[in-house]
Amino acid sequence: MSKNNKTTEPTAPQALTAQFSEQIIDERLTPNPLSQFSMDKDALRLALVTAQYALRATRQQTPPILNKPTGLLVLVNGMEQAGKGTAVKQLRQWVDPRLLKVEATVGDCPLAYQPIWQAHTKALPRHGDVMVYFGNWYADLLYNVMRMATSDNDNANVNANDNVNDNVNDNKEQSKNLKSKSTKSDNDKALPIAQWQAYLQQQLIKLQAFEQDLAANQTRLLKCWFHVDIETLQARLNDDEADPQFLYQIDWNSKKVIETFNQVATVLLRQQDDWIIIDGDNKSDAADHFCHEVLQAMQTALMSSKKNTVNTSDKSKAKKQAQQALKSAKFEPVKIPKCLKNIDDAEIDKSEYRDALVEKQVRLAQLLRARKGRHIVFAFEGMDAAGKGGAIKRLVAPLDPRDYQIYNISAPMLYELQHPYLWRFWTKLPNEQTDRISRIAIFDRTWYGRVLVERIEGFATDEEWQRAYDEINRFEADLAAAGTIVIKYWLAIDKKEQLKRFEARQETPHKQFKLTDDDWRNRDKWSDYVQSAADMLARTDTEYAPWCVIATNEKRQARLDVLDHAIKQLSAVCGS
């Protein structure tokens, strides 16, 4: 099976100069929009609350409308004392505060074994809502980068008493900071590429991809970077009481720290051109500017919501779309591999099975203990009655029940549909903040439903499920890059054996609950599911998250094969 590795390669880092370039901020600073347009504050306030209610109203909950409203996530970052709090306070006063969600972080060390964005996904707004998020994943990133950058410097131990006030006169030009253009000296020597710079650029590539996936799934982002010059910053720091929770947990009184932060900000803003930079020297003007940017973003989200509202009352049209999916000019189905057609049904002796099962379960438990806290995600997919539940039962038998969580994935709930598609899986991943013990997640059906049942039943558009292959690959690549072990299974069964198991379930009272009308309906579309599975395996079998196809006509052997593959994967990572 071919391996897909479509992760974006980072561009070569650019060396920073010894003299901090102020041009990036200066060129990107935008004037207060209220000075450009004939909109006073009263008009802006009315427009904001009107747009807020109009956006909320797009979130329809009744059929037959397939409604895909857009949510708005406002990321607020930048310098300390730059007017961020004042701006968000004004926004909340001008809109209906009950409908505006606000979250805040100051930045902390990214959690072990999970992508930098993962800890923040539960806070994402529902479609049709607006949320302001201070700090967010960029605060965690900047916190980590600043720690690396200060340790990279020759003077790693920054003198906390090296106050900006001591050097204001000597640094008059730099005190104007980031708003007046500076000319680089011909003798200005380039610094070598620092470790923190390469790390930052790599993380920004991943975050940009994550944010693009959010936008493609009806969550629009507005990214606002608040900037203030050094003299104003120092004056505000002197006026306010000391804050033990300074943004990014750095000492904003230190000249060296600010110089380092400016270098970090330069790399970030060079690489990402979607930040709105707001001049925070005048807090009132900054608040007006911020509110205007939020208004424009809400209006754009509103237009997107209306565009995405599709009338699906004509069921025959939706069915026809699903039938024509395989004929899409943008998508070429793959040839169905033998492992999905020729299912091995070799039997194993019952006593031999029991001995092997115990041996493999003991070995699996040893490897899981040796993984030293690394997160593990087991993903089970397969045809109905292929034995996912039985395989999972044997997989967890040797484990402490506190060590793992099992998620039985079915049709999404309404609130889950009001978030990006992958959101309901992001929020179930092992989390260092909440999962003190259970850092193993086992999914009985997974995020691959988008390219299986949703594709076949027409619950996702052609564009959505075809795009999902790359989205899923990026998701799993981020998990693997963070140190999470991803183990994926496709349990293969033939049509004859499936019918045999369906009939057995019908005749067994304590198993009748396992058989539903959907199971029979899915069976009628057997060939569609086999083709979709083949396409899925071909497009999402990667080096960092490979598929393992298990023949399950013979249940006992299948359960042993599931354990064998887990042992093999964990041995490669944790040692033999």
Give the location of each predicted region.
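Glycine-rich phosphate-binding loop of ATP-dependent small-molecule kinases
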Residues: 2-576
